[in-house]
Amino acid sequence: MLVKKIDIHVHSCLKRGTPRFDLDFSDYTTPGELRRMYDELGIEKGVQLPEIGVECGGHFIGNEESYELVRTHPETYDWFCNIDPRWGLNSDQTNFSYLLNYYKNLGAKGVGEICANLYFDDPRVMNLFAHCEACDMPVIFHIGSFPYGDYGLVDELHLPRLEKVLKTFPKLMFLGHSQKFWAEISGDLTEEDRDGYPTGPVAPGGRVVELLRKYPNLCCDLSAGSGENAIRRDPEFGYAFLEEFQDRLYFGTDICAPHNEMGLSKYLD
């Protein structure tokens, strides 16, 4: 008998809203749709991640709606709250602990997915991380490009800014996600391949592997095509990676719409 999985990364809505123009004009899953998908995939429940960023198009899912999903469908959802570092007059002095503790008292287990299109070490982002660390709230981040046409925290090839924040906030758990994170699993990554799904054998010296070995506060979110590709592109490496870092890898789907396919779930089964 297979053990049912917990999904660290899902986006749902209570009811249909504005079609998302960044997602082929479909919308998020409703609780009933997600439950049917989970039952087919052998997933017990998932962590709802609010979508609050201006970089994400169409239907925004706030903290209150996400909490309501958990309150009305506790068999399907846990949740993270989400905070944009620019909230609070776009200042690097905003007291985010007030909000974090408020949502933590409502059962939020962390913060994410952080998609603000700012540098990892922007003072406003560093301020948010400091409050997350103080409130013991792990964060899930998406890595993007800057300044146009993308979403997510910004870093250069080989993730020097991510290393800076890992070093600065040793008690804060970071969960890495997205193409620009998972492409760094291979040591031969180039700038041209950062935003895609590289194929072929994984070369030694990958930055993600190096950072995992160096910083115990870095964990990984295996969701979406990027996480699946990192594990499946080189099966021998993938098995070894899963074995070495098994206590710091979180299964996820990143289900955003009812038609999404989840190859990693079946592969791991």
Q: Which role does the model predict for each range below?
A:
Residues 1-64, 110:
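An N-terminally biased module of ancient metal coordination in phosphate/nucleic-acid-related enzymes
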Residues 5-8, 47-50, 80-82, 112, ...:
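Active-site neighborhood of phospho(di)ester-bond hydrolases with catalytic His/Asp-centered motifs
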Residues 11-29, 40-41, 74, 178, ...:
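Active-site gating loops and adjacent loop-to-helix segments of metal-dependent hydrolytic enzymes
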Residues 13, 18-20, 52-54, 85-86, ...:
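A short, flexible beta-alpha/helix-coil linker loop
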Residues 27-38, 88-103, 204:
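Short, acidic/polar
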Residues 31-35, 63-70, 96-100, 125, ...:
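Generic structural signal for well-ordered alpha-helices
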Residues 45, 56-157, 224:
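Active-site gating/metal-coordination segments in enzymes
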